Every structure is written in C-alpha cells, then in structure tokens.
Amino acid sequence: MKYRCFVLTVSLLAFVYIDTFARKNEPSFAVIVDQEVMDNCKSALEKYAASVEADGLKTHIIVDRWNIPDSIRTVLYTLYKTDGLEGAVFIGNIPVPMIRDGQHLTTAFKMNQQRPWEYSSVPSDRFYDDFNLKFDYLKRDSVNHLYYYYSLSSEGAQSVNSNIYSARIKPPKYKGKTRFELIDAYLEKVVREKESVREISRITYFAGQGYNSNSMVARADERISLIDQFPVLAQGKGHLNYIDHTFDESVKWRLMAELSREDLDLAILHHHGAEDTQYLNASPYASMADRWLDMARKFFRGKIRSARDTIASKQYYIENYNVPESWVADAFDPERMKQDSLIDAAMDIHIADLEGFTPGARFIMLDACFNGSFHLEDYISGHYIFNPGHTVVVKANSVNTLQDIWSNQLIGLLELGVSVGNWAKEQFTLESHLIGDPTFRYVSSRKKGHDFNYAIAHRRDEVRFWKKMAKEEHPEIKALSMKILFQKGVMNPDQLYVIQTSDARPTVRLMAYQLIQQRGSDMIVPSIKAGLYDNYELLRRFAGIDASKNQSPALLDDIMLLRVSPGITKRVDFQIRRAAELYPVEAALVAYDKQLEGRRGVWYEQKREEKANLERVLAGNEKNMMELLDPKVEQRSKRFNITALRNSNQTAYLDSLFQFMKESDDQSLRLLLAEAFGWYTRSWKKCEIVDFCKRQASVETDEVVKNELLRTVKRLTD
C-alpha cells in the first residue's frame, strides 16, 4: 500500500500525517504516537495502519512533538469536523489529562479533592474524545510530566457523550524488554488477529467474591440476557460459559485456564480490583469444617501480625473471642507466614501471575476498579495485551467504578461486526477506557444487510434509517435505534414506557427504562414502579437504585412492600433497604406497618423486629439534617453529613438544606452543599433545587459559591 507524508502544524502541536490515497468521504482513524515510538517502531506502526486501512478506515499517524493535551484535542476535533474521524488510539507516552471537578461524570469516584492531586483527579481520555465537555487548564505535574490537570468547566456539557472512541496502547513494566520491543510485538499481534477473520461465538463470564452481593439470580439473568443479545448463542451455534468464585477454594487457576483457551472470543469478568490485582476470592471457598477452622486460625494470625501492639492484640483475641492460644502461637513463625502468604496470593490474579501467560480471548472486559490505571508505570490490564497470546483489547477503569452498572449494554453489537471502539463509545464514563486496538472487530454473523459499524459512527443523523432499524427483531439493533431516536427527540417517554412494559426481550425493556430516567417527564415514577416488578433482575435493581434517588412519595408503598418481601433478590434488597431509609420518619414507619398488616409467620415477625432498626436509622438521618442548623455542632460532623448527600440525595429535609445554604456563614460548607445539590439528577425535587440554586446564585456574594451553584444548575438541566 502506498503512503504519502506531509507535515502540518496546528496550534502548538507539530504532527506528521501518514495517509493513503483514500476517498474524501471515507471514515478515518488517528494514531497518536510520541516521537521516540515513531523513531523506533515505524515499520510496525505502518503495518498496523495498513491493517486498519484494509478494514475501511483512512488512517492518520500523528506524531506528538509538544506533549500538550489541548493541541492533541484540537487536531482530533479538526479531523472529526473535516475528515470523518471516528476514533483514535494513543501509543506510547501521550499526555494524560487528570480531571478535577468532574466526579459526577464517574460512576463511583468521590474522593476529597483536598487530597494530593495525583490521587484525587481522574485520569481520563474523555478530554480527547468528548468535544462537548469543556475544561479549564490548571497545571502540569511537577514530578510526572505526563500528567496535566484540568477542571471540568461548567460552561460545557455535564454528562459524557463521546463523539469519537479512543484507546491507549501504553506498555506496562516488563523485565528485560524495552517499551519499543513491546509495542512492536503487540502491533504485530494485532495485525495477525485482524487477518484471522473470526466471528464471535464463544463467550465466558465470571463473578468474583462480593460482586453484586453474590447474587446468583443476577448471574442467572445475565446468562439469559447474553443469550438474547447474541442470537448465535440462542441458535445453538456458539457456547456461553460461566465461572463463579465458589467453584474452587482458589478459582484463579480455573479462570486463567479458561482465559487461555485458543477458541475464546470474549471474556466478561465481574470482580473487585486494584491497579495490580484482580480480586477473585476473598478467602478460600470451602465446605468442610476442618477448612473453616484453618481459615479462622489464619484470620486471627493475620490480625495479630497487622496490629501495632502484637502482644496486646493476641491477648485481645484470646480473651474476647475465646481463641485458643495454640491457634496463634506460630503467627510469626517464618514457615507459617510463608504458607499464609501463599494462600493469600492464590486468592487473586496479580501482575506476577501474568508473566508468560498467553490469554486467548481477543477482547476481555475487566468490570472492576483500577484495573485500567494506564497512567501508572505498571497496571494489570496492560499485561493482557502485551503478553503473547491473542488478546488485543481490554476494557477497564482508571479509578474505582460502581458495581451496579449495565456493563453489557449493547454488547451484542459485537456479533454484528461493530468494532470494540464503536461499541464502547456508547457507554463511556470518565473512568472507563479501552486498552489496546479499538478498531478490532469480529466478522458480522450477518452476511448481508447494513454495515452497523459504519452506521453507529456516521449515520446517527439519519432518522428515517433508525426508525426502520427500530423494527428489527435483533434486540441490540432495536435498543441502539431507541437510544439514537430518543437522543434526536424523535422517540418520547410515553413510547418508551410502552416498550418497557410490553417487550419480551429484557435488554430492550432495560434500554427503554434507562432512557426514560435520563430526561424529566411524568413517566419517570410510573417507569420506576413498573421496573421494580420486572422479571429481569438488572432492571429491578436499577429501579431500586432510582427509587432511592427519586424518593417520590408515590414510590413509598412499593418500596416498603419489597422491603418485607421474602422473594426479593439479594442485590435488589440491598438497594431497596437504602431507599426505605431516606423518607421522613413518620411516613416511612406508617408505610412499613401497612405492608405488615395481616401477615403471619416467622418471616414477617422478623420483619416486625427489624422495624426498630429502621426507626433508628430514620431518626439518625433526621438528627443529622437538623444539626446543620445547630451552631454548637462541630464543622467536621456537618461536612460529613453534607458530603453524604452525594450518595443519598436526601430530600426529606430539603427545606433545612435550603435554610443552611441561605443562612450559614461557613463558606466552605456552603460550597460543599452547592456541589452536593448537583448530584440530585434523578430526584423528584430536581426542579425545586434548580429554582433554588438560580435564586441563590442571583443574590450570592461569594463568587466561588455562586459559580458552583450555576454549575449545579447546568448539571441538573444538562
């Protein structure tokens, strides 16, 4: 393939295009590389670019010579507007935007920004791929020069809706190998995998200890939905495998063997994580009494070892837990410590375990916290793609992430030839990232028909096309069409409610539900009510979450009915319990009693006994809100209670919060409350909060508080 090269300067960035003689209307893709990678890996880069070109994407190789995120963003935006850019990949040491004041764009990250900036900022490439977001430059890190800190501006969008997809190809630490050798080998692997031309038909999913409250119903329903999302599975032409952390005392070896299967196409791994660890088993899963005793002995040995005063700790457990001294006598014996350490290491997958490992799954989703911390020198997801084997792309998170998310949303599009990048773009959050080649895609199971990979990126404005696609039988095509038509204002909440309450396919109903909840309408509460009783666990779970965030009085009876229901599933119960604790004391207790009237049996007697604890929690919430107005209560306590509003979205005492905002002379707490109001995006009181923030901003004398109030208005109306 012939290439032509020319040099162009935009803003502060000098870059090199390596381009084919392609038609102007062809979609394009950008490869951003640092100068050293270009100098040392040019041949591999050109082969990779040629493989992307062969798949229909005009490819630009752009050399970053200035290390300035704003300039890279400018180039990408220019290509997006003028050259049909659909995605980009950052290879090597490309600047890392570290985002501040944007925690509401994450699913779970809520760290105090007073902590060191490298920890309290979110490494995010949404800076590069979402052009609706606006950022204010703050500074460059004085130690790690790749870190550039930005504040999310209130002038831009307050939700993620990426215009293009993006990914990182950044080598982690490998002993004895340079980053250039690793990049060369990886790009050669990508080219080979692109040439292999395979359909997706073999999928494995996994659940680690403690994930989604260990709900087996959640995992069973995930199987049902995956079979629905991938018709090839329903037709008996593929294979769907499930591994649970309870299958073995240490499930690690089974999971690694499964991931190394040559014929595995996709692996979806739900577990907890860190930048260097995939947490699988918290402790050995055992069913025999002798193993329970072994684990108990090991537990107390570990507690004593980690104590500041080991002698006092040992005596404490002996006296308070009746632990025999013989159980812990060898706590510091070197051989015993080694054995305990080996048991701990066998519980999880660590970076060291991946040395020489050859994963077979082409695409792996790590639905876990921190596994995608690409900004660090070493990170576990990077080892999956840079190892030998077949894995070319991983989806992972740069910081912590929420368990209760729809991680498999639209994943069946992969069966239709949609690239991993175009699929991932539909559910990017601030922390979610692709590690590897985002253009990788499986061959479509449909030999004829529309090119959905092209349509998802370049036909979004064709309303007539998506109306036609909304009539498709394939649930993922219908769900995608609904999403696009809703974004275009063509499909309304009433139409979506009909779909939510009548469609036979669980993921189609869930998409309808999710879309209704995104925009204020009279259908929000009816949608939540219907969702609470849907037969799809994930939809019920989301309805439970939204019931706790909405807190409409119209939902209270349903919440309390489910609160005492014996058939409620574990993770839905977790969400419903939270919702039940957010209402005013008297109303909540009356509703609770109402659902127990006339009910007999041990189960309901236990629920009556639980009322005392519910009343204690409700009274505690009321006390916390009232203390905001008490000048005798220390600031630290008030700060904690205000910060907690980000999660609770408490509306029962909204008048007290408004009063505090108007009357308090503590500007730091007022600023904190103004920011906390911005989390009430799904509250039944959202409009009231918006009106209050507007009025308060109009008379606010503190400029910082005023700006935060206006930012909150933007967040609640975006």
Where are these regions (language model features)?
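Catalytic cores of nucleophile-dependent amide-cleaving enzymes
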Residues: 121-186, 294-406
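Structured catalytic cores of large enzymes
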Residues: 70-249, 258-266, 273-288
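Amphipathic alpha-helical scaffolding segments comprising HEAT/armadillo-like alpha-solenoid repeats
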Residues: 459-468, 489-501, 521-532, 552-564, ...
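Structural detector for internal amphipathic alpha-helices that build alpha-solenoid repeat scaffolds
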Residues: 452-457, 476-488, 507-520, 540-552, ...
